[in-house]
Curated annotation (Swiss-Prot):
A GO molecular-function descriptor: arginine-tRNA ligase activity
Name of the protein described by the UniProt record: Arginine--tRNA ligase
Enzymatic reactions: tRNA(Arg) + L-arginine + ATP = L-arginyl-tRNA(Arg) + AMP + diphosphate
Primary localization class, coarse: cytoplasm
Cellular localisation: Cytoplasm
EC number: 6.1.1.19
Gene3D superfamilies: Arginyl tRNA synthetase N-terminal domain (3.30.1360.70), HUPs (3.40.50.620), Isoleucyl-tRNA Synthetase, Domain 1 (1.10.730.10)
KW Aminoacyl-tRNA synthetase (keyword) present: yes
Annotated gene: argS
């Protein structure tokens, strides 16, 4: 039950009804109409911009149009008052008797309250993490992993058919570097001698067990062999070991994927899908043979002064056309990425979302152009960029990890502060803003720690329900049964404010899904928790506001219904974020 969507329909009907006296009203674009909470709760329950966005098309003053719309809205059931404010904003106050019905709908739906058909079952591919298989995941990967996972969950809750995908970059030069690094650890294990890891290779201790396993399997077989003999073998083994490590890291963070897609598969089994994709683009005129001009200012990636295959990315708004084939005949990363997204299209995805690190921001425009070109405009690519994470402890930057060699691993952070703290805090700031993650602060049990504050609200709700059951054994346990409680007994301003806050959950879900902004869920849950804790604290000072009233069963039932509603929305929202809705704080 989306109150805002329901009344948006009423507003559109009111505008359409004006067609009798204003013929132009029948041809208006009503999609611009928004119904939202007023900025000041004292102004009512709902506000709409209808007159402000439609007046120009009707050649009317916004306030004059607002008066006409308001007169129609005043006749809508459950509307107690309609006010026109300022230049033409319309504020609606609903009957007090309307809100118990909203709470009852919430209680009947439980944690499914807010589930939407916004997506209409549209297939969406969400690709995230896609860390190179060259080592353990670090704290920088963590943000994109949590963001992508929460976004996928949010989209699924909003009615999209979501596929979660991880792209394994196992065909580039970095996996050869991995193989050479593993070989040195193999020599170390096979000979018992300490090997110095030169610059340009991976120095982390995480490759030590890989080398030991290789030594156990191959003994001294490859100690004197040329690289050409051992490189493919060591590369395959090391990639497998790294992906197993990455999967374990992801599992610790509560993340799983539907698809792991290998870059190497694009040119495997005798079929060069990268080359085929380039030829397809050549036939449509999107790829041509030409020379790039010398770079101006910052160097252009992959620039070489030679005749080469170029993608016409400038035709799609990019700064320069982009190379697809290197001078040694191998493909650029860009060429492989085009073929990969073509594969997504061939698998039926017309909507793709990629989650990248902010350092890939310059890659967005060309990749979107390529997707448009390779799918003949039938598919869209949206890219969400995640900014850097600064890892702190009591305000001081955390030193690098010995295990990783040059960074702090995701696993170290999760092991220290827990999955829930990591996930919630990674989402408690918009993804395009730099995040300071303080290991000391995220485990504080205080109001200043958002994850504790929200989880504690759910635990407090469950504690109230347990206490009520202990005092009155005949009370129902199911929240759905409380939908039949005398909810009109909820008359306190704080109670009604909390009901109205909960009523905003379906709208919040659709807004966050449409904007691809799961941080909105975290912010909203914090607001719900704040209001719930506030109402509980009022009951400490004013006994008549407590949730359990000894001599008034009906009022107790109504307030316990509200507690069930709070718990359901908190559990639903935390579930979307991948955070546990705990019943007790430890």
């Amino acid at each position: 039950m989306n109150v805002y969507a329901i009344f948006a329909d009423h507003v559109r009907e009111a505008v359409a009804a004006l067609a009798g006296e204003l013929p132009e009203a029948g041809a208006l674009d009503l999609s611009r109409i928004v119904v939202e909470p007023p900025r000041d709760a004292a102004h009512g329950d709902l506000a709409t911009n209808a007159a402000m966005v439609l007046a120009k098309d009707l050649k009317m003053k916004p306030r004059d149009l607002a008066e006409k719309i308001a007169a129609r809205l005043a006749q809508v059931p459950n509307v107690a008052k309609v006010d026109v404010a300022g230049p033409g904003f319309i504020n609606l106050t609903l009957d007090a008797g309307y809100w118990p019905g909203v709470l009852a709908a919430l209680l009947r739906a439980g944690t499914d309250f807010g589930r939407s058909d916004l997506g209409g079952g549209e297939a969406v591919n969400v690709e995230y993490v896609s860390a190179n298989p060259t080592g353990p995941m670090h704290v920088g990967h963590c943000r994109g992993a949590v963001f992508g996972d929460a976004l996928a969950s949010l989209l699924a809750f909003a009615g999209f058919k979501v596929t979660r995908e991880y792209y394994i970059n196992d065909a580039g030069a970095q996996v050869d570097v991995l193989a050479r690094s593993a070989y040195l650890r193999y020599r170390e294990a096979a000979t018992g001698e300490t090997v110095e890891i030169p610059d340009g290779l991976y120095p982390g201790d995480y490759l030590v067990p890989v080398g030991k396993t290789l030594a156990e399997v191959h003994g001294s077989e490859y100690l004197e062999s040329p690289e050409s003999e051992w490189l493919p073998i060591f590369r395959t083994f090391a990639i497998g070991a790294m992906m197993e490590m990455i999967r374990d890291d992801l599992q610790a963070l509560g993340i799983s994927f539907d698809v792991f897609f290998s870059e190497r598969s694009l040119t495997a089994a005798g079929i060069d899908r990268v080359g085929l994709t380039i030829e397809q683009l050549r036939r449509t005129g999107e790829v041509y043979e030409g020379r790039l001009p010398p770079p101006k200012g910052a160097p252009i990636e992959d620039w070489e002064d030679r005749e080469q295959s170029l993608f016409r990315s400038t035709a799609h708004g990019d700064d320069v056309d982009r190379p697809l084939v290197k001078s040694d005949g191998s493909y650029t990363y860009f060429a492989g990425d085009i073929a990969y997204h073509k594969d997504k299209f061939d698998r039926g995805f017309r909507r793709m979302i990629d989650v990248w690190g902010a350092d890939h921001g310059g890659y967005v425009k060309r990749m979107q152009a390529a997707v448009k070109a390779v799918t003949a405009g039938q598919a869209t690519l949206d890219v969400e960029l995640c900014q850097l994470v600064r890892l702190l402890r009591n305000g001081e930057q955390v030193r690098m990890s010995k295990r990783a060699g040059s960074f702090v691993t995701l696993r170290e952070v999760v092991d220290e502060v827990g999955r829930d703290a990591v996930r919630f805090m990674m989402l408690f700031r918009k993804n395009d803003a730099t995040l300071d993650f303080d290991l000391a602060k995220v485990i504080e049990q205080s109001r200043e720690n958002p994850v504790f504050y929200v989880q504690y609200a759910h635990a407090r709700a469950q504690s109230i329900l347990r206490n009520a059951k202990e005092q009155h054994a005949d009370l129902p346990e199911s929240g759905a049964i409380y939908a039949h409680a005398p909810l009109d007994r909820l008359t306190d301003e704080g109670e009604l404010g909390l009901v109205k806050r909960l009523a905003g959950w379906p709208r919040l879900v659709e807004q966050a899904a449409h904007a691809r902004e799961p941080h909105r869920v975290a912010f909203y849950l914090h607001e719900v928790a704040s209001e719930f804790h506030g109402q509980w604290n009022r009951g400490k000072d004013l006994p008549h506001l407590r949730f359990i009233i000894e001599n008034d069963r009906e009022l107790t039932m109504a307030r316990l219904a509200l507690v069930h509603g709070v718990a359901a929305v908190l559990a639903s929202g935390l579930g979307l974020l991948g955070v546990e809705a705990v019943d007790e704080m430890k």
